From Swiss-Prot:
Gene label: pgi
Coiled-coil intervals: none
A molecular-function term among this protein's GO annotations: glucose-6-phosphate isomerase activity
Protein name (record): Glucose-6-phosphate isomerase
Catalytic activity: alpha-D-glucose 6-phosphate = beta-D-fructose 6-phosphate
Length: 549
């Protein structure tokens, strides 16, 4: 990939000039100028996903300049480099090939001259066989009973993705009960173990190195809990499987290495749900639905790689996001799914985006001081969020672009619940875009029989300025296929922005310093001695903890 500071490009300079005139134009004025703006500013994927970006403060000129910026930042070359197995993760000297995990076309993908697809397919076949044995009841626990509960022990990408997807696809769930343990806080594993039976529980230990502190601490606690009942250590093999590459450590734990499912260093943690890390997903919904999830992502991969930039959904979303943060001054983006099953979707992409693009050093090793990189990502399902934080989105002093996501068809057609949900989905983006003027507020009061003298003091508080940018993503129905496509769409959006921010999106050195310091502090907590080796604040906190424990 070429290392290009975006602010040095002609397109960036043109965008700065364009913004000076465009910033005075409101979204409402844009709709007045372009009567069928929806048609020109929306894109469809597979006739199952509609992305409407018309309620953004962009024009055809804006989009043209943003596309020129993508061209000057050599985006198409970067896309080809990623898909072809080039080692674009330079700081770790790794390829970035989560797309190969869902390569349903099975076309060769080379890393260091070797096609990775035979190994990918072998692990998928192994996962399929394992899922069949567990789901069918053929796999027995140490007392001869079938498995009823699966506990996935992992953290970060080994937890967030599988948990998000299993929740999103609960309508496809089989009889197995899925549980997820991530936090090293003993409460998490303790509360989970209260819900399961050692005779019928299967633990999946998800750690590439089998050394991750949080995961292995929880895994050993689960093992101790299991052996308190099972007694015989040979029984561990019937109740534990590993998602790892460290066969020696896996065997030492007591897991049969035949039940170790590997993945590769070209799979980043936050992009790993497509790999063996997704075994919990496959166990929850069945392997055929897991394959449909992969297929949806693969179709989005093909769209991203082949669609012209004008029709390219992930690229368009990325460019508009860059415009909102770097020219309109937004610092956050909210992801607001109007689907309760998607209640972990925003949290998943909080990691996906912020761990990928939360960088202040560019690919040249230079400090970035004249443009913004990754935004803060957050969100909650609608309509809950409307009664929590939408107030600030509508009337606060901070610009918060939002992605609204909703399915046209619900899995639970209870009375008129879905119509009420979707009426809010449609209403919110309309309200955010167009607001309510002082004159409209006054007219409402007059219609209600109030005189303007009576209400003049309250009128300003009921005015909505509007002009708040949103994307509306309407999905025909949340299925394994469409969910796979949605996830891949956001993954590629993140990638595009990383390319254009001139940063490395696939490392995460920011998580290391805290871990190093925690490893230094841990032995200091083993006794009651007063600590003086840190700054006064850290010393004071540690010493107070020692007094209170």
């Amino acid at each position: 990939m070429k290392n290009i500071n975006p602010t040095t490009t002609n397109a960036w300079k043109a965008l700065q000039q364009h913004h000076k005139t465009q910033s005075a134009v409101t979204i409402q004025q844009l709709f007045a100028q372009e009567k069928d703006r929806f048609t020109d500013y929306s894109l469809s994927f597979n006739n199952e996903v509609l992305v409407d970006f018309s309620k953004n403060n962009v024009t055809k000129e804006t989009l043209g300049l943003l596309r020129q910026l993508a061209q000057e930042c050599a985006l198409s070359e970067a896309v080809d480099a990623m898909f072809s197995g080039a080692k674009i993760n330079k700081t770790e000297d790794r390829a970035v090939l989560h797309t190969a995990l869902r390569n349903r076309s099975n076309s060769p993908v080379l890393v260091d001259g070797k096609d990775v697809m035979p190994e990918v397919n072998a692990v998928l076949a192994k996962m399929k066989d394992f899922c069949h044995r567990v789901i069918s009841g053929e796999w027995k626990g140490y007392t001869g009973k079938a498995i009823t509960d699966v506990v996935n022990i992992g953290i970060g990408g080994s937890d967030l993705g599988p948990y998000m997807v299993t929740e999103a696809l609960r309508p496809y769930k089989n009889h197995l009960n899925l549980h997820f343990v991530s936090n090293v806080d003993g409460t998490h594993i303790a509360e989970t173990l209260k819900k399961v039976n050692p005779e019928t529980t299967l633990f999946l230990v998800a750690s590439k190195t089998f050394t991750t502190q949080e995961t292995m601490t929880n895994a050993h606690s689960a093992r101790n809990w299991f052996l308190a009942t099972a007694k015989d250590e040979s029984h561990v093999a019937k109740h534990f499987a590993a998602l790892s590459t460290n066969s020696k450590a896996v065997a030492e734990f007591g897991i049969d290495t035949n039940n170790m499912f590997e993945f590769w260093d070209w799979v980043g943690g936050r992009y790993s749900l497509w790999s063996a890390i997704g075994l919990s997903i496959a166990l929850s919904i069945g392997f055929e639905h897991f394959e449909a999830l992969l297929a949806g992502a693969h179709e989005m991969d093909k769209h991203f790689r082949t669609a012209p930039i004008e029709q390219n959904i992930p690229t368009t979303l990325a460019l508009i996001g860059l415009w909102n943060t770097n020219f309109l001054g937004a610092q956050t983006e909210a992801i607001l799914p109007y689907d309760q099953y998607l209640h972990r979707f925003a949290a998943y992409f909080q990691q996906g985006n912020m761990e990928s693009n939360g960088k202040y050093v560019d690919r040249n090793g230079e400090v970035i001081d004249n443009y913004q990189t990754g935004p803060i990502i957050w969100g909650e399902p609608g309509t809950n969020g409307q009664h929590a934080f939408y107030q600030l989105i509508h009337q606060g002093t901070t610009l918060i672009p939002c992605d609204f996501i909703a399915p046209a068809q619900t899995h639970n057609p209870l009375a008129d619940h879905h119509e009420k949900l979707l009426s809010n989905f449609f209403a919110q983006t309309e309200a955010l875009a167009f607001g309510k003027t002082k004159e409209e507020v006054e007219a409402e009061f007059v219609k209600a029989g109030k005189s303007l003298d009576e209400v003049k003091e309250v009128v300003p508080f009921k005015v909505f300025t509007g002009n708040k940018p949103t994307n509306s993503i309407l999905v025909q129905k949340i299925t394994p296929f469409t969910l796979g496509a949605l996830i891949a769409m956001y993954e590629h959006k993140i990638f595009v922005q990383g390319v254009m921010f001139n940063i490395y999106s696939f490392d995460q050195w920011g998580v290391e310093l805290g871990k190093q310091l925690a490893n230094r502090i841990l032995p200091e907590l083993a006794n009651r001695e007063t600590i003086t080796t840190h700054d006064s604040s850290t010393n004071g906190l540690i010493n107070q903890y020692k007094q209170w424990r």
